[in-house]
């Protein structure tokens, strides 16, 4: 079943029932929940998972419990959204789509999951016009449109006995007010001593007139399918599709440790290959930023 609650100041006709009907044949216990406000959808699902784990420990005599069921949690407004490396994600009702998908997952290799998620999102939002891909993917977790950030992905996991529960957070700009970005960019400059990023873009630059509900219906069910495909097949099923949208391939990049080089695509498990003066390096965890000379952060 599905639930939806909408604030009076920003009513949205969320397609919760349609998404549930599309997904439940594969995940019978799947639910969709929409909250008017939360600090972070990822934080909320991680809290629920920890609380359920503690409850299970207190009832250990009853046997080994199952991990929490699959859920899609949507927030109309996040007041403490999080991105990779603890970065803030600003979210206002109607301006952004913010949601998290949580489900038990047991892939043979977790490497490349965020890239697979990005592939699914980009393919779901790409206009079917037979043209070259418009939406690009910046390793490891950003969606780009016109070399500006459209959205981001945050993947977190929690242990549940011998199982793991994954929480996949997604934030997409539907329409981003300039004043929101200006404040965030100013704060970023004060906090990091780095130049402020370029202004983000939004889905309305690609699909004029769309709203967050439209975007959710476009991406939700295909994302669930992609995650299940990743569980069975790993990153191999997504590698070529990622390469077709790789925003960094052939570009000069700078790593957070100061190393500079040219991005040369991703490996079999999603690591970024960078050709440096000391040879080819495989990067799996360091933050990557495009050189300032490329005019993109």
Q: Where are the regions that the model predicts?
A:
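Long, positively charged amphipathic alpha-helical accessory segments at protein N-termini or as interdomain linkers
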Residues: 2-12, 27, 53, 106-135, ...
């Amino acid at each position: 079943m599905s639930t939806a609650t909408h604030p009076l100041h920003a009513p949205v006709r969320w397609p919760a029932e349609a998404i549930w009907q599309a997904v439940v044949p594969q995940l019978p216990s799947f639910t969709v929940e929409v909250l008017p406000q939360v600090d972070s959808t990822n934080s909320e699902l991680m809290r629920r998972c920890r609380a359920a784990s503690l409850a299970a420990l207190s009832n250990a005599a009853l046997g080994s419990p199952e991990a929490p069921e699959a859920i899609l949690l949507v927030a109309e407004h996040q007041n403490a959204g999080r991105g990779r490396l603890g970065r803030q994600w600003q979210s206002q009702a109607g301006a952004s789509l913010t949601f998290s998908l949580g489900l038990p997952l047991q892939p043979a290799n977790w490497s490349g999951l965020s890239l697979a998620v990005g592939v699914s999102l980009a393919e779901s939002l790409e206009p079917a016009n037979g043209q070259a891909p418009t939406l690009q993917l910046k390793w490891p977790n950003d969606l780009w449109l016109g070399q500006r950030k459209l959205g981001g992905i945050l993947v977190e996991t929690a242990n549940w006995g011998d199982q793991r529960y994954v929480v996949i957070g997604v934030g997409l700009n539907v329409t981003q007010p300039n004043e929101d970005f200006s404040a965030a960019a100013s704060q970023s400059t004060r906090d990091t001593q780095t130049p402020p990023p370029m202004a983000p873009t939004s889905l309305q630059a690609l699909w004029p007139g769309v709203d967050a509900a439209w975007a959710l219906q476009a991406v939700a069910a295909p994302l669930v399918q992609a995650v299940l495909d990743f569980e069975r097949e790993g990153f191999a099923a997504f590698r070529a599709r990622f390469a077709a949208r790789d925003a960094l391939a052939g570009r000069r990049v700078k790593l957070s440790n100061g190393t500079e080089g040219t991005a040369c695509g991703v490996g079999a498990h999603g690591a970024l290959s960078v050709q440096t003066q000391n040879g080819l390096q495989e990067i799996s965890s360091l933050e990557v930023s495009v050189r300032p000379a490329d005019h993109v952060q």
